[in-house]
């Protein structure tokens, strides 16, 4: 969105820097190559990259506005799950009937390993949209069935697909998805 900007500078300095250092210091800075039997001053490739520009590039690339079937616009920060600041949101369907209590139990289990948010304000759809906009890859919804079957609904930010999973499996599912090795 900002036009063409340099993210990383790569400069072939050839032997200029080391050659001048050798010239003015009076010290030989050479490498002996045994395969060809010669000494030479090595070439230098200089790179420079700024974290702020890299971060801006990731954010700019991740921001999307999607048109939904109902005509509304969905704002999504589709940052890769391992890089997302908030990994999971815990959302009780309503603020009564024991759902917030179970949601807090789940939050307490997850919060030591993942940056989590708890939200019970507004409708579940509005809460999903808020989490989409800040880049939260997973929303865990606790509903009335959760009290009986000990399962929750996990909603994936990018696809909006939902799946029922056992509460006991939740931690390992999220761990697997937010593992940094997924993007390396």
Enumerate the language-model features and the residues they cover.
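NTP/phosphate- and nucleic-acid-binding module
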Residues: 1-184
